[in-house]
Amino acid sequence: MYQHNTEKFGSFERHIFSNPSSKNSFSIVPECGAVLIDTFFAGINVIDGFSMPEELESFKWAKSAVLYPFPNRMCDGAYTHDGNTYNFPVDNAATNNAIHGFGKKMPHQIVSMILSENYAAVTCRNDYDGYLPYYPFPCCFEITFTISDDNKMTIGMSLKNTGENTIPTAIGWHPYFAISEKIEDTLLQLPDLQLIEVNERMLPTGKKENYNRFSSLEKINETSLDNGFFYPKSRKKCRSHFTI
């Protein structure tokens, strides 16, 4: 049977969902971006999250952050919508970009919870009223974490426009996985994708190229990946596989 417990995590409260029998569990901090701290299957953690409260306070590397109202980088923090120009704060000094939106540190509330024999699910919500001058668009973001005894974790996200006008938005998630001691020995398999080209400021150039590396399970070795990928809508499922 899954259980729900809480404990102090620095100035935050950590919510732990666990099944002592299967040793499956995960923990989140709703009041700081509903960030996922860890995920255990059979007692083995597969998420490289913020292990200490001090790390969460700094939010370095945005580990397991929810990304909204934009998931990537914004050139000079500026964007135009319906003829109006807005400027997000530049929070990535190295590239002079705004990065990952503001959702990653927004307070979220638990709005539903299921604890059963074989799985646990929790939904967190942030009702944003549009108070920031650089994003004056009310919206509601929800994220649901579900863990089950068949060693699966499912994460579902949605963002609903709660205002009267159209809004510019996109969402994403920023996980770091716990891997073997040497990343070179980690095995990776990807579906057929298109790699999104970026410039020296890590901004998309608008170009894409087919990426067929790792079409079968193979070692990462010296491969460096710091790009986004495009997956055609015509395909119903996108699944990646890695072995640690």
Which ranges hold each PLM region?
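Beta-strand-rich N-terminal accessory domains
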Residues: 1-88, 92, 242-244
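Extended, loop-rich substrate-binding clefts of extracytoplasmic carbohydrate-active enzymes
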Residues: 1-9, 84, 89-149
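Residues that act as N-cap/strand-start positions at coil-to-secondary-structure junctions
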Residues: 9-11, 22, 33, 73, ...
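Acidic, contiguous internal or C-terminal segments within carbohydrate-active enzymes
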Residues: 17-19, 30, 126-169, 173-175, ...
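Intrinsic-disorder/low-complexity, polar/charged segments enriched in Ser/Thr/Lys/Arg/Asp/Glu/Gln
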Residues: 23-25, 119-123, 140-142, 152-154, ...
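Broad, structure-driven detector of short, well-ordered beta-strand segments within folded domains
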Residues: 24-28, 143-145, 188
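Glycine-rich, pocket-lining loop/helix-strand segments that form or immediately flank
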Residues: 45-61, 84-107, 189-210
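Active-site/ligand-binding surface loops and adjacent short beta/alpha elements
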Residues: 87-88, 93, 166-167, 176-244
